[in-house]
Amino acid sequence: MTMNRPRILVVDDEPPLRELVMVTLGDAFVCDEAGDGDTALARLEEARYDLVMLDVMMPGTSGTDVLRHMREDDELRDVPVVVMSAWQSPQDVASALEAGADRFLAKPFRIDELGSMVRALVGRSG
C-alpha cells in the first residue's frame, strides 16, 4: 500500500540544521530544502507544500519576508509555517506570530518537540 507522504520545505542557511530536520522528519514526510529566502520562494512556486519550516535570519530575503509573501499569496496563505530562530525574546516570538507564523520553535530545539509540532500542524491542515 503506497500513500502520499506530506511534503515539507525546510528553509535555513545552516546546512547541518537543515540536514538534522530532514533526517528527523524524512521517514514520515517528503522533505525539500532551501538555504536562503530566494530559493525558498522559488521552491514554493515549483511545488505544493503541507508545511514550511522557516528560519528568520538568513542572508538576502529574510524568513520574515518569505512568510509575509506566503500570507499575501492566495495559493500559499493557508500553508502552516513553523518559524525557527535563535532569537527568542517575547518580542521576537510576537513578531513572528504577527507576521503569520503558526508556531515558533526556539533554536536549539529538542527533536521530539520538532516531530510533535510538525505532526500536529500537518495533521490539522490535511
Regions found by a protein language model. Name each.
Residues 87-88:
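Short, conserved "switch-loop" micro-motifs in signal-transduction and mechanochemical regulators
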Residues 58:
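Receiver (REC) domain active-site loop signature in two-component systems and cognate sites
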Residues 15-32:
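Two-component/phosphorelay signaling modules centered on CheY-like receiver
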Residues 91, 109-118:
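C-terminal output helix
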Residues 33-51, 69:
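Acidic, metal-coordinating helix/loop segments flanking the phosphotransfer/catalytic sites
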